[in-house]
Amino acid sequence: MKLRSFIGSRVIKTGIAVLLTAYICEWIGWSPVFAVITAIVTIEPTVSDSIRKGLIRFPASAIGAAYAVLFIALFGNSPVTYALSAVFTITTCFRLKLHDGLLVATITSVAMVDVIHSNYVMEFFIRLFTTTIGLSVSTLVNMFLLPPDYQKNIQTKVSSIAQELGKQIQGIYYCLLHVDEINNESKYLDKLLELDKLIIRAEILSRYQTNDSKYHFTENNQEKFKDIKTQLHFLRIMHYHLTNVIDHPKEQINIDEKEKNELLNVSSYIAQVLKKELAYNSDDIQDKRTRLNELFWKEKHRTHNLSSDMLNKLPFELVMLYELISILELTEDYFYTANLHKENAN
């Protein structure tokens, strides 16, 4: 476990794949160099990527080997052969959209120039077989040895995102409802950008796990992961609504002290629940949603008395209320899904 955490699972798997590939090639009596090169580049973050890219790298390597044999036959072992092998391999792979196999194909092509001396056709097929060995061994190692499992990592990130989002919800509404804090708005924008990056990283891991779920997950595990993905989706939409609030053009906020305190109270409640400082209670959510809806319709009725010039854009008071109602509903959805996840775990 210490070794795995120190150098990483992919590095360990790459080393094992290289070792097994070299042993197999030595046992058959073939040079392991090309098989090892293929094995190194085939270990991907997910098993599905290893298989998908392997199916691209095999024909790409065949193209590289074919060009190497062709130009060796025409020009012998010369600088021209190296150049033409590289150029034609890159061009052909690019034209055929074999982008994931371009690097290994080019390396195979130029490396073959120095090792082929006779029997060109036999050398070509040997390279295809060694490439197949490298692809197969790496894919099997990636699938069965320390298989990629991002679920715990994603779950940890989801929890961290929820807590940070809670801080931002409370901080942004406090900032907007206090004139002396309005200068801190840019600080919250920067924090929202950082939070967006964290969400994107979690979404990338989620895609990795989704791609590999058909290889390793039991039905129960798939349900758990589906719940975690749904929670991440709700957090993404919360972030979107919060960004809408802070990005909306602002003028002087026309809101009385009672309404201001209600907004601050609800934003603080959401923050405490997301940060797990307060236990989630669906009745509390319903109560706060009812009060916010009353404020929203009251504010909307007030805007009917405004002039048409003032209604060219939605009043910021309505924006704050609408977005907070949306965030509150998403908070309820988030914890409903979290409770489902706990039930599935049991």
UniProtKB/Swiss-Prot annotation:
<dbReference type="GO" id="GO:0005886">
    <property type="term" value="C:plasma membrane"/>
</dbReference>
<feature type="transmembrane region" description="Helical">
    <location>
        <begin position="55"/>
        <end position="75"/>
    </location>
</feature>
<keyword id="KW-0472">Membrane</keyword>
<dbReference type="InterPro" id="IPR010343">
    <property type="entry name" value="ArAE_1"/>
</dbReference>
<keyword id="KW-1133">Transmembrane helix</keyword>
<dbReference type="InterPro" id="IPR052984">
    <property type="entry name" value="UPF0421"/>
</dbReference>
<protein>
    <recommendedName>
        <fullName>UPF0421 protein OB2406</fullName>
    </recommendedName>
</protein>
<feature type="transmembrane region" description="Helical">
    <location>
        <begin position="102"/>
        <end position="122"/>
    </location>
</feature>
<feature type="transmembrane region" description="Helical">
    <location>
        <begin position="16"/>
        <end position="36"/>
    </location>
</feature>
<comment type="similarity">
    <text>Belongs to the UPF0421 family.</text>
</comment>
<dbReference type="Pfam" id="PF06081">
    <property type="entry name" value="ArAE_1"/>
</dbReference>
<keyword id="KW-1003">Cell membrane</keyword>
<feature type="transmembrane region" description="Helical">
    <location>
        <begin position="128"/>
        <end position="148"/>
    </location>
</feature>
<keyword id="KW-0812">Transmembrane</keyword>
